């Protein structure tokens, strides 16, 4: 986890609009995987995420990139959780800076929110 904590520290102290910063981050994470993972979670309307049911991994050794995996999606596809059903804005929920302690505390949306500050990442995500 020290590698991941180092990544988060770098992201928290960097200007995400800087292309050089984005290039550095892309050496830490599989950017395509991160984009696809977030698109999938938002598309299926997973309400038990991102602060819960989040798994990410990295191959051991030098050069391994962080990747995220989709799992435990039973609170998705419009489950009428909190009485909102299909009217819930999952994208807005996933980028809330001060979300509720469950299921999206600020730490769980931090990396995604910061990456969206970069125009290249944002363009690829959209």
Which residue ranges define each predicted feature?
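Catalytic-core segments of enzymes that bind and process phosphorylated/nucleotide-bearing substrates
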Residues: 1-126
